[in-house]
């Protein structure tokens, strides 16, 4: 009844990268290298893990009371080293990096990072006649990501279940096969932050004197915080399992409440500190919801069966607290300065925060002047601080929210007019799988879905306009407002002529013109880039055939099956990007980002299962 088990693993990898630009490239020219520029990087990493568990099981009173005790220990360690060297000003480019003495060192960088995690844990399980079940666990984790005094976290949990259908008062209920009530409470820790964030690090930088480069120490962008500690999530769960009609209908319902405190967040700090951000334990959030799983046998005959598996989940998040922010009850988390997220006490996570896009200025927003020019009509909003005489038809326009006006009483908008413009959290998600079997044939069709979630289409924002060097534009810019009269090849100021050139200016799909006025439109935090990400995906279809036993018995086979599987067959969605099921490069505070996410591939698999 006593079992001791040990598991161990080791990983080592090395990556070497050599890069060379001869003197004819722009990169070499930018690095003052008429005969070439290059760098050589060497990265090495190894990690190991050892887990030991001791398990003891015993019973009392002829298995009426079953006990199981487990004790365990786990150690994980990783270390990485890197050496990066850049060379420029080569006097001869024929040898490349084979002779770096031909050039001058530009940057020499090296680094070493270590990370370790030590865990001890225990579990006690008790089972009384498969009717009453109890489990308690205790886990302690020590992480090198925190400073001494904060490295260890203690995380207990417990669960209980009551199989009500085993009670005497239900033994005469023939249609009921299983009725089980479950309840659980537990805690878990999270240390998912960059390494060494409890200390302030420094890097190397350049400064020039008399045409020569000198290397010096410079502070990093992140200020260390020795007070960092484990993020903690407390989970409460109540569930019910029901099986009826000879287990042809099985239902599981779970209600859960997860509260996370001491959230580890990289927070913006005043630039007067000399740094831009710092990891802090600054908040608490709650996720609450219900999950439902339904399994049914819809048809069951001698030759044909049809089973359905269906699941659906409803989750609602809420920000409970924000520490260290007494002035306001919210803060704005920017993602690469391209979209804002409003994290606000009492509100859900995933709130996109930006300006409300109001289409473009049409010719109706202007008055033709006697000198052939035009001006913006009074009462038409414009950007605060921007000369209204420079506004043109086809410029992007936004909705003022604050009621602010300029000195002439005209409404204006600014960054103060940003508001909540969407939410990345779906109202519900789920999936359904139908399996059909007829004699030796089987067919399985799986679909999954999400409804009510918004997506920040960063791909559109990046490539919508030709404002960056060597950048093409998306095809939607073919339907842009034009200021150029093709008969003259010049910009026209005639409003009547502009209306003739842009008959679709009142449509929802008209794009702004590509004048300098709209250069900021590719970086504005705007509702234009927020789209409905709801979808229904036909994810997998599998068709198989199992050969009759009498066909294969002479081949010394006990079972033989051939099958074909199609993956990612089709997706029904209104999203304009490749895939609405995205969250590229995003975290809990910045979800729902499509940053040129690689599209899911369609694939097929043909296989054979043989059992000897």
Question: What role is predicted for each listed range?
Answer:
Residues 1-21, 32-347, 520-612:
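Extracellular/periplasmic, surface-exposed regions of secreted and cell-surface proteins
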Residues 28-29:
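A conserved P-loop NTPase coupling/switch region
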Residues 84-86, 91, 280, 297-422, ...:
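Conserved small-residue
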Residues 143, 452-561, 566:
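Extracytoplasmic gating/loop element in the C-terminal half of outer-membrane beta-barrel translocons
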Residues 430:
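Extra-cytoplasmic beta-strand recognition segments
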Residues 438-458:
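Glycine-rich phosphate/pyrophosphate-binding loops
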């Amino acid at each position: 009844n006593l079992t001791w088990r040990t598991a161990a693993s080791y990983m080592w990898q090395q990556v070497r990268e050599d890069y060379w630009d001869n003197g004819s490239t722009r990169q070499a020219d930018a690095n003052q290298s008429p005969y070439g520029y290059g760098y050589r990087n060497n990265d090495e990493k190894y990690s190991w893990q050892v887990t030991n568990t001791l398990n003891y099981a015993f019973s009392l009173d002829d298995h009426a009371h079953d006990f199981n005790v487990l004790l365990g220990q786990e150690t994980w360690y990783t270390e990485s080293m890197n050496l990066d060297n850049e060379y420029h000003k080569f006097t001869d480019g024929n040898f490349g990096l084979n002779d770096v003495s031909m050039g001058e060192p530009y940057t020499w960088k090296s680094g070493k990072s270590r990370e370790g995690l030590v865990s001890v844990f225990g579990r006690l399980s008790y089972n009384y006649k498969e009717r009453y079940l109890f489990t308690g666990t205790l886990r302690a984790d020590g992480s090198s990501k925190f400073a001494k005094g904060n490295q260890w976290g203690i995380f207990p949990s417990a669960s209980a279940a009551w199989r009500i259908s085993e009670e005497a008062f239900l033994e005469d209920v023939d249609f009921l096969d299983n009725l089980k009530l479950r309840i659980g409470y537990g805690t878990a820790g999270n240390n998912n932050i960059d390494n060494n964030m409890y200390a302030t690090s420094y890097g190397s930088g350049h400064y020039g004197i008399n045409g020569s480069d000198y290397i010096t120490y410079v502070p990093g962008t992140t200020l260390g915080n020795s007070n960092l500690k484990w993020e903690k999530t407390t989970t409460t769960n109540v569930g019910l399992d029901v099986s009826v009609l000879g287990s042809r209908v099985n239902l599981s319902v779970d209600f859960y409440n997860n509260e996370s405190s001491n959230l580890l967040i990289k927070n913006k700090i005043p630039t007067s500190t000399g740094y831009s951000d710092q990891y802090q334990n600054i908040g608490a959030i709650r996720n609450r919801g219900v999950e439902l799983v339904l399994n049914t046998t819809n048809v069951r005959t001698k030759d044909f069966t049809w089973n359905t598996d269906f699941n659906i989940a409803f989750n609602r998040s809420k920000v409970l607290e924000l520490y260290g922010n007494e002035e306001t009850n919210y803060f704005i988390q920017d993602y690469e300065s391209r979209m804002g997220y409003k994290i606000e006490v009492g509100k859900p996570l995933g709130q996109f925060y930006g300006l409300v896009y109001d289409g473009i200025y049409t010719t109706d927003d202007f008055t033709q002047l006697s000198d052939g020019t035009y001006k913006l009509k009074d009462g038409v909003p414009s950007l605060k601080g921007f000369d209204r005489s420079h506004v043109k038809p086809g410029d992007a326009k936004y909705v003022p929210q604050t009621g602010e006006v300029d000195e002439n009483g005209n409404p204006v908008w600014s960054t103060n007019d940003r508001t909540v413009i969407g939410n990345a959290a779906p109202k519900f998600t789920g999936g359904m799988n139908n399996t059909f079997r007829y004699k030796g044939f089987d067919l399985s069709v799986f679909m999954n879905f999400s409804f009510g979630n918004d997506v920040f289409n960063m791909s559109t924002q990046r490539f919508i306009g030709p404002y960056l060097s060597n950048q093409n534009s998306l095809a939607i810019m073919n339907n842009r407002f034009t200021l150029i009269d093709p008969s003259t090849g010049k910009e026209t100021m005639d409003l009547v002529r502009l209306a003739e050139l842009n008959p679709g200016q009142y449509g929802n799909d008209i794009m702004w013109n590509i004048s300098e006025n709209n250069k900021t439109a590719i970086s504005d935090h705007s509702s234009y880039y927020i789209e409905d990400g709801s979808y229904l995906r036909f994810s997998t279809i599998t068709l198989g055939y199992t050969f009759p036993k009498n066909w294969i018995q002479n081949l010394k086979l006990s079972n033989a099956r051939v099958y074909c599987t199609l993956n990612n067959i089709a997706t029904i969605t209104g999203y304009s990007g490749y895939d609405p099921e995205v969250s590229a490069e995003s975290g809990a505070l910045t979800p729902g980002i499509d940053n040129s996410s690689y599209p899911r591939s369609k694939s097929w698999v043909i296989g054979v299962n043989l059992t000897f």
